[in-house]
Amino acid sequence: MKSRLSKSTFIRGLQCEKSLYIYKHHYRLKDPTPPSLQAVFDQGTNVGLLAQELFPNGVDASPENHFKMFESVEKTLKFITNGESIIYEATFQFNNVLAALDILVKDQEGW
């Protein structure tokens, strides 16, 4: 897969196609992230960690970095095969589309 389009980059494209193009093809030209926006990103990360506390004892399928999302797909499949029932940052691929979940939980009814 050549390119990854997350929810936030998809929204960026809906808001401004030029912004999406620059972000995906000329990333080094983008303006630095303002501290106020970085605080919003950090808050989102904190919410994710708090959500994990609602489902303790899970395993983390996060990739080493966000440019290695297929690593997360492999970890997710390994965890499912090994019988894990709570997977943080579970990621799946179908037809070159990646879908990442904050928390995947298996209960008596299934996933």
Enumerate the language-model features and the residues they cover.
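Metal-dependent nuclease catalytic cores that hydrolyze phosphodiester bonds in DNA/RNA
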Residues: 1-110
